[in-house]
Amino acid sequence: MRVALLTREYPPEVYGGAGVHVEYLARELAALEDVTVHCWGGDRQSAEGGPEVVAHRPWNALAGSAPHRAALETVSVDLAMAAAVEGAELVHSHTWYANLGGHLAKLLYDIPHVATVHSLEPLRPWKAEQLGGGYALSSFCERTGLENADAIVAVSNESRQDILASYPAIEPERIMVIHNGIDTAEYRPDPGTDVLASYGVDPDRPSVVFVGRITRQKGVTHLLDAALEIDPEAQLVLCAGAPDTPEIAAEIAGKVERIRAERGNVIWLEQMLPKTEVIQLPSHATVFVCPSIYEPLGIVNLEAMACEAAVVATRTGGIPEVVDDGVTGVLVPFEPP
């Protein structure tokens, strides 16, 4: 079967869990079927034995200013992807960035469209801060793609319920739950400390570690608001980059500056690190923190637990389906009881 995977993220341009998911899904599917990945960005080299990779860039002829232009660029890539997948027998889209492309391919070529839901636009109202009026367009792309998909994959049972609540037109039997997974041959404790040393992290001192994008969804602002409650001897290590907007980037920078002035011991790695480097952070963490306010699954917790880190995470979304409270981690209600 010729399968077309549509995604915004694909290595080396990965900034979130959806990109991690698609990387491994494409690798494993390519061993079984004829798979082509259609993604955003610069040209990629197709790995030997792996899927063919075709990259698409937004149309540079689009006019307009940020933030709504970003949503228009997404539609331009969706159109390009839909045109490029001719000959596929099944199209599989990931996130709102590709859902419309999957739907258009379904209509054009009369092929099944499968959509994996990694998050839902109705449950991320803060996206209006990032996209402005483009948030209405991103919501339209997602709704159109999902309501007309032949099958939908939810990454947790809680996410399945969220899909049904957000889009009542979707019949329950169209949704199946397949939890995200990770490659434990890659994510395992790394005894090395060279990466830590290069970023100024002392492996012999306790550390509280956060890894994630700078976005309202990941709750990093709430972690920083609680930072003064952390033992001042502990290092607060933030591996946090790819801010949604300049405004939230400035907000985080201001909070970090104030915390440093009061307690010190804050190490902020402002770039998204490669996977091989990130693994050392949870491998040596005293506590790995996931303060998300919305998380359909939270693949970062799987990665941390595979590195034998103790996880403290919010009890939200699909997190309780992978973090066993009191066994593999501690779950904390987002709102005070």
What are these regions (language model features)?
Residues 111-114, 122-144, 161:
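Nucleotide-sugar donor phosphate/pyrophosphate-binding loop at the beta->alpha transition
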Residues 158, 181:
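Carbohydrate-associated surface elements
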Residues 240, 249-272, 276:
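Nucleotide-activated donor-binding/catalytic signature segment of Leloir-type glycosyltransferases, i.e.
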Residues 293:
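Aromatic "clamp/platform" in nucleotide-sugar-dependent glycosyltransferases that forms part
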